[in-house]
């Protein structure tokens, strides 16, 4: 009896052959490369040869798409037509959906179950032919019909119906456009102020300057900067809707640079409320709105750089007020306009620009104090005294401020103190006398000028100002006659 045979085992695979098999396996598992038909499509050629494709008809209602093999261009089925393995693919922008709204899967296609071509987009669109289409696919179909008739193609102008805005609460611009929300809220209460002056030997008036302000009472009280309205004879206010009114000056605080004017308006006006500037924090977003260069309702944004920039730091020796510093752009004409927080509350009055990115606003807490005191004065019937002005905006010059300006402007005068002229308002005594921007007033009537307050004090007392100003590296003698006006 023979012993049982051992089971047959194939000879061991040589190491070299095993290595070749391992290297070949991933290559065979890779998807078909470009030029190869989709491996899952039944009846597709091994390689796609576009030269062997039959040319599609000249006009395709559903547009031209690739066939199931991804090789040849064919006419896609239009919206609402049947689709599937037997019927062919859907047209451009359409998807094949079986009953109950389920997209046709590979399993459904293998079972040869038909579906319907449905547009992947279901929102209306407005076309360049001023027509509203139910969806993008219908617009594309209309565009193809136009091209067949040798007409211009129809393109998409906007989402949504023609003539209507697109409100998508889930869009990023709808969620995060908080600045626009603030502007929309405050703009109706911001006014444009224009200042007029009579020409000599003529009754004709001409506009000579402009500024901004904001309404604080429904009956027409408006807050602005004192320097905006105390230097001209007639003040005109223009509302956002274009209506214009003559304004009367009710009260002025020159030291704080705040003024209160009033217009007579029938009906109630929109107003802005004052916020608490004491609660303001560095880094908060702020919005400045006004009429720079007479461009009404111009909006700039920025952050609060500091909430307490002391007047003495700005060279205002006798100032007891802390200013709000912001990098929001404030230009000529923005003066008097509101600086608001994201709640739409006024936290300051735009008042001063030193240079790009460094601007200052009077805090709203100071405005509240002014309005309260003004109410008391008017309730007691105290008369407002006449005001003198020469028509300049100035700031006190300190050694640190002079160094900063010297670094920015090489031709800045070589001085360490005085009153630095930021702006000379047209058609004023200052302009008539020859003062210019960037001049530094160093003496008046033989008395040295150390700060802007020295100039203000002399203007109140003297009827003639014999000034010495430093312009570049020259000292120039200038005579200015202050003008007295009724507030």
From Swiss-Prot:
GO terms for molecular function: growth factor binding; serine-type endopeptidase activity. It is found in: Cell membrane; Secreted; Cytoplasm, Cytosol. PROSITE patterns: IGFBP_N_2, KAZAL_2, PDZ. Disulfide bonds join 44-69, 48-71, 53-72, 60-75, 83-96, 90-117, 119-137, 126-162. Coiled coil: none annotated. Gene3D superfamilies: 2.30.42.10, 2.40.10.120, 3.30.60.30, 4.10.40.20. One of its GO terms (cellular component) is plasma membrane. Residues 40-120 form the IGFBP N-terminal domain. InterPro entries: Growth_fac_rcpt_cys_sf, IGFBP-like, Kazal_dom, Kazal_dom_sf, PDZ, PDZ_6, PDZ_sf, Peptidase_S1_PA. Residues 1-29 form the signal peptide. Keywords: Cell membrane, Cytoplasm, Disulfide bond, Growth factor binding, Hydrolase, Membrane, Protease, Secreted, Serine protease, Signal. The keyword Protein transport does not apply. GO terms for biological process: positive regulation of apoptotic process; programmed cell death; proteolysis. The active site is at 227 (charge relay system), 257 (charge relay system), 335 (charge relay system). Residues 211-371 are annotated as: Serine protease. PANTHER family: SERINE PROTEASE FAMILY S1C HTRA-RELATED, SERINE PROTEASE HTRA1. This is Serine protease HTRA1. It comes from Bos taurus (Bovine). The gene is HTRA1.
């Amino acid at each position: 009896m023979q012993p049982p045979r051992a089971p047959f085992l194939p000879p061991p695979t040589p190491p070299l052959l095993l290595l070749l098999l391992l290297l070949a396996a991933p290559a065979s598992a890779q998807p078909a490369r470009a030029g190869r038909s989709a491996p899952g499509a039944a009846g597709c050629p091994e390689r796609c040869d576009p030269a062997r494709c039959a040319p599609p008809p000249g006009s395709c209602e559903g547009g031209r798409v690739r066939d199931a093999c991804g090789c040849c261009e064919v006419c896609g089925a239009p919206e609402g037509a049947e689709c599937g393995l037997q019927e062919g693919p859907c047209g451009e922008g359409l998807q094949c959906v079986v009953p109950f709204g389920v997209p046709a899967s590979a399993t459904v296609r293998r079972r040869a179950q038909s579906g319907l071509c449905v547009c992947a987009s279901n929102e209306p669109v407005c076309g360049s032919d001023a027509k509203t289409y139910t969806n993008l696919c219908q617009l594309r179909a209309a565009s193809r019909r136009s091209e067949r008739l040798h007409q211009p193609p129809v393109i998409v102008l906007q989402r949504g119906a023609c003539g209507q805005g697109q409100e998508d609460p889930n869009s990023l611009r709808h969620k995060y456009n908080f600045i626009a929300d603030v502007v929309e809220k405050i703009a109706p209460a911001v006014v444009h102020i224009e200042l007029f002056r009579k020409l000599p030997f003529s009754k004709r008036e001409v506009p000579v300057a402009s500024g901004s302000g904001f309404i604080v009472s429904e009956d027409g009280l408006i807050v602005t900067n004192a320097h905006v309205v105390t230097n001209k004879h007639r003040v005109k206010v223009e509302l956002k809707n274009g209506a214009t009114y003559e304004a009367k000056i009710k009260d002025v605080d020159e030291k704080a640079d705040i003024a209160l004017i009033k217009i007579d308006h029938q009906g109630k006006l929109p107003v802005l409320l004052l916020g608490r500037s004491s609660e303001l924090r560095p880094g908060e977003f702020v919005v400045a709105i006004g009429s720079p260069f007479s461009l009404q309702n111009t909006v700039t944004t920025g952050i609060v750089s500091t909430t307490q920039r002391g007047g003495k730091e700005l060279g205002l020796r006798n100032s007891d007020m802390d200013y709000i510093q912001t990098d929001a752009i404030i230009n000529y004409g923005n003066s008097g306009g509101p600086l608001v927080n994201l709640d739409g509350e006024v936290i300051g009055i735009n008042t001063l620009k030193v240079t790009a990115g460094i601007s200052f606003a009077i805090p709203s807490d100071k405005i509240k104090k002014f309005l309260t005191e003004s109410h008391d004065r008017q309730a007691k019937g105290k008369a407002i005294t006449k005001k003198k002005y020469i028509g300049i905006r100035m700031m006190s010059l300190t050694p640190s401020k002079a160094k900063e300006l010297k670094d920015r402007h090489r031709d800045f005068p070589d001085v360490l103190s005085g009153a630095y002229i930021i702006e000379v308002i047209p058609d004023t005594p200052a302009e008539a006398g020859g003062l210019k921007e960037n001049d530094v007033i160093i003496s008046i009537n033989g008395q040295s000028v150390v700060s802007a307050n020295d100039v203000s004090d002399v203007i109140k007392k003297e009827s003639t100002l014999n000034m010495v100003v430093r312009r570049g590296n020259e000292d120039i003698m200038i005579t200015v006659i202050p003008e007295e006006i009724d507030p």
